[in-house]
């Protein structure tokens, strides 16, 4: 009963932030003023296509700043109205593609990006959104071509950061880091929005954390928060880093701040894992219940968290049948490597290791340097008694990033030691028999 009251209180607090705002959203004032400005223009002239486009742009920026999906819905209405008045407005069509992308409607996003390109083939941002949509459905070569075309048209924060993301997926972490560093410099020179620069700084911090380089990761997470104090991504990234440093009280505080800005299920799950790590099981349970509560609310808000929930259920060995169904549903519209990874992990947890092997091999196909992927592969091969491959991938997980998870990094280390002991024991027994 106490746990349920806690969940309700958290949700009420979250909704209050959305409905009434907070002093912590002060940096969004400029965007709010732009929204008001365009609304005033439209009251004077309801047929002003440019004002509808400007309003749509400002609403998208607001959605990115605070993570409220309703702003994307409002942006869609404004952009469609702009296109009704001026059907050849390539910018409005491009922005509409971005709205669809943000809602995980990737086919619609790609289709609208292509329409924007037909209207204006010199608009690099349209190629960028097309590449984003293609990337999410696993069409990596086509995504690369779109990003390269964007880069030909504009060397910007947005083109550099997109190429960096693709390079990271392909295992070129040095190239990704170099592109992100350049993206930040170019973005500052061009006076791009603070939220966009902060996003890139957070991404660079995440790249460093993925390699276990905590000092560099900390530098860029803090830089992101200095650029844009309400960067919930940077707050969560810094929370993960503090957990890796065993500064658990700070990690808890940072996760709570991130959740207060945007209640993402993976943030609540990560906070729960920190509580579990330090033996505060009651508070861990509260966060795990919050994950499911957010998942249920997301259905009402038309926000898809299938992947996050499928990972959460599998990681915590709950609702495994439902979790597998969620994971497999991902493949219906999203065939990137992480769709295959979440399916592989859920198949493994449901005792279907042979099928899991096929899926994890697809997840590993790009050469991505992700300790979580390697951990999943190691555990799957371990269950198949493929000891050499299990050792290889568990060792790669720990060498890539020994801090990749507060609980599973330790699980990986224990499994690797067990495998090494069994191999040594088999060798000793073999020598004894030979003697």
Regions found by a protein language model. Name each.
Residues 61, 68, 102-103, 136-137, ...:
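Register position in tetratricopeptide repeats
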Residues 54, 95, 129, 162, ...:
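Canonical tetratricopeptide repeat
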Residues 46, 50-53, 87, 121, ...:
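Residue signature of alpha-solenoid helical repeat architecture, marking inter-repeat boundaries
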Residues 50, 57, 91, 125, ...:
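Start-of-helix register in tetratricopeptide repeats
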